[in-house]
């Protein structure tokens, strides 16, 4: 039996978000729907989830002592990481002391860097992956590239949104790629992964829920990447029945090996009927924002249900839908959005994240659309994005 208290009362159920971006904001909203007390934590003030939380804190989440202190002050029943850059050793210790880390400390620790999850998938579970090598110096990086061959991709073992990633076609690019990777890591300079290029027809995110009543799969989400970050996503991605079955088998193996209850974003390459594992996030995925319009339970609602120990039962997908990001490039601490009326309508929605400032290119919102097919939905979402005028 799951008992939920009422926010701001002595018996409140408290959820602490570690990372308070746009994904955490939607998780906070789903918690609010259930009367849960929400505490939002991030490294900067006025982060999106802080707007819809009962309280907030600004700390360096890679500082284990600072993390332990804020948890001791707030005494959350559930600790919900939204990002990778967290002192996961501290989370593991706190879990050993009886705290509930979502989905579990092992999952957050293994997936905080690409090395942990790649070794689990390829070496322990025997899942198909790209060829890869790890390196922690420029010399070993060059050796890794020689072993993998050209073309290849280099990524910091801990980064997100394409930061520090390079596509390498020739030896002349190696010095710059190494330098860029060292600048792009979430925790600063360090190890990198060198991956062989996989020939694939498309990429998918298979949103997979590990819940008290079993493992559930959302319809596959297709997406387009640019500069290492997603620009549009759509659901459902058409694929063969055999490929879908293989994708679900891989996702099931991965989430059960990681453990705990929650939603996982499993990233896969698909080529015909073949499926290759890429990465996994033990939390809602940015490409999954399409589920805000495409499903009866969004990825955020599913995550909250799962980690609270509530049954999922079933997931209803309404039909073709898409998301497209609002990604302006400017500098401002007072952003406004004009012509919004052109971005909403029947089967057309928009979300502005409420980020407090922008300096360069930053994702500030997303347009959501339905359509007769995914192609039409993508066109409608992109048109909505182009209609919005972002002002300084």
Swiss-Prot record:
Pathway where this protein functions: Purine metabolism; IMP biosynthesis via de novo pathway; N(2)-formyl-N(1)-(5-phospho-D-ribosyl)glycinamide from N(1)-(5-phospho-D-ribosyl)glycinamide (formate route): step 1/1
- Ubl conjugation listed as a keyword: no
Q: Binding of N(1)-(5-phospho-beta-D-ribosyl)glycinamide: at which residues?
A: 22-23, 82, 286, 355, 362-363
According to its record, what are the GO cellular component terms? cytosol
Substrates-to-products reaction catalysed: N(1)-(5-phospho-beta-D-ribosyl)glycinamide + formate + ATP = N(2)-formyl-N(1)-(5-phospho-beta-D-ribosyl)glycinamide + ADP + phosphate + H(+)
| InterPro entries per the UniProt record, alphabetical | ATP-grasp, ATP-grasp_carboxylate-amine, ATP_grasp_subdomain_1, PreATP-grasp_dom_sf, PurT, PurT/PurK_preATP-grasp, PurT_C, Rudment_hybrid_motif
Q: Which NCBIfam families match?
A: PRK09288.1, purT
**Self-association state and partner proteins as the record states:** Homodimer.
Which protein family is it in? Belongs to the PurK/PurT family.
Q: What does this protein do?
A: Involved in the de novo purine biosynthesis. Catalyzes the transfer of formate to 5-phospho-ribosyl-glycinamide (GAR), producing 5-phospho-ribosyl-N-formylglycinamide (FGAR). Formate is provided by PurU via hydrolysis of 10-formyl-tetrahydrofolate.
Stated name of the protein: Formate-dependent phosphoribosylglycinamide formyltransferase
- Which organism encodes this protein? Salmonella arizonae (strain ATCC BAA-731 / CDC346-86 / RSK2980)
* Gene name tied to this protein: purT
């Amino acid at each position: 039996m799951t008992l939920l208290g009422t926010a701001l009362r002595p018996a409140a159920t408290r959820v602490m978000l570690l990372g308070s971006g746009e994904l955490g904001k939607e998780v906070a909203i789903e918690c609010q729907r259930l009367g849960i007390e929400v505490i939002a934590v991030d490294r900067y003030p006025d982060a999106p989830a802080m707007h819809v939380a009962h309280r907030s804190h600004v700390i360096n989440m890679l500082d284990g002592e600072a993390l332990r202190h804020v948890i001791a002050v707030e005494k959350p029943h559930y600790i919900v990481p939204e990002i990778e850059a967290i002192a996961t050793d501290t989370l593991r210790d706190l879990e050993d002391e009886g705290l509930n880390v979502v989905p579990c400390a092992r999952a957050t620790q293994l997936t905080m860097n690409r090395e942990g999850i790649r070794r689990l998938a390829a070496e322990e579970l025997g899942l198909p992956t790209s060829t890869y090598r790890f390196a922690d110096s420029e010399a070993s990086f060059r050796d890794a590239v020689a072993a993998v061959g050209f073309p290849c991709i280099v990524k910091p073992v801990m980064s997100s949104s394409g930061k520090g990633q390079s596509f390498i076609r020739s030896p002349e690019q190696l010095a710059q790629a190494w330098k860029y990777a060292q600048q792009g890591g979430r925790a600063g300079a360090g190890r990198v992964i060198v991956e062989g290029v996989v020939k694939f027809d498309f990429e998918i995110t298979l949103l997979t829920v590990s819940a008290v009543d079993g493992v559930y799969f959302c319809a596959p989400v297709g997406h387009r990447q640019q500069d290492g970050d997603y620009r549009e996503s759509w659901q459902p991605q058409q694929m063969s029945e055999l490929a879908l079955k293989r994708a679900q088998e891989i996702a099931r193996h991965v989430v059960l090996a990681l453990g705990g209850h929650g939603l996982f974003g499993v990233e896969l390459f698909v080529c015909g009927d073949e499926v290759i594992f890429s990465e996994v996030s033990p939390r809602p995925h940015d490409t999954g924002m399409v589920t805000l319009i495409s499903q009866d339970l969004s990825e955020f609602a599913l995550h909250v249900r799962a980690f609270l120990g509530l049954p999922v039962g079933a997931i209803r997908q309404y039909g073709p839908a898409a998301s497209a990001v609002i990604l302006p490039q400017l500098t401002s601490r007072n952003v406004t959005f004009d012509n919004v009326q052109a971005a909403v309508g029947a089967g057309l929605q928009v979300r502005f994240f409420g980020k407090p400032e922008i300096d360069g290119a930053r994702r500030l919102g997303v347009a959501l659309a339905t359509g007769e097919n995914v192609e039409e939905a993508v066109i409608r979402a992109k048109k909505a994005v182009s209609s919005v005028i972002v002002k300084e």
